[in-house]
Amino acid sequence: MEKQITVYAVSDMTGETVARIVRAASAQFPEGNVTIKVLQHIRTAEQIVDFIEAQSDPGPVAVFHTILAKRTREDLRGALQTMRIPSVDLLGSAAHVMADLLDERPHETPGLTIDDGAEPAYFDLA
C-alpha cells in the first residue's frame, strides 16, 4: 500500500540544495508517495510553524532544512519537537563539524558558496 508523506524542504535561501537532498532520499522509496514543499528565504522558526499549521497534509510530515543561523535552528528544533514533527538539520551539522576541525566559528550567512574555482577531487573506487 502506497503511503503518502509530506516533506517540507526549508531554506534560508532558494531551497535548491535541500530540495535535491530530499529528492535523492525519496528516490530510495519508489513505493512511497512523497510530496515536497519548498519554503524559501526563511528567517524565523515562526514562519515555518505558521506555514505548516496552515496546511492540510493528508499524511505524516517531516522537515528537512539547511538553515544556517544557530538561533533559528534551535528555535525550529524546539517548535518541531513540540509539534512532534521529525526534522533533519542538513547544513548545521556539517558546519558544526567544520567549525570544530577549523577551530573557527561559521559566519552563518545565507547564500555563501566557494566560487574561487576550487573543485573537489573525485575518486572512482568502483
Residue ranges of predicted features:
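Metallocofactor- and cofactor-centric catalytic cores in central/energy metabolism, strongly enriched
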Residues: 37-67, 71-81
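Conserved beta-strand scaffold positions in the cores of enzyme catalytic domains, especially
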Residues: 36-39, 87-89
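N-terminal accessory targeting/assembly segments
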Residues: 1-21, 25
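Structural motif
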Residues: 10-13, 65-70, 92
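Short, surface-exposed connector motifs at secondary-structure boundaries
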Residues: 3-6, 32-34, 56-61
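Short helix-loop-beta junction
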Residues: 24-33
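Ser/Thr/Gly-rich flexible loops in soluble cytosolic domains mediating phosphotransfer, phosphorylation
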Residues: 81-126
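Non-catalytic terminal and connector segments of soluble metabolic enzymes
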Residues: 1, 32-33, 73, 77-87
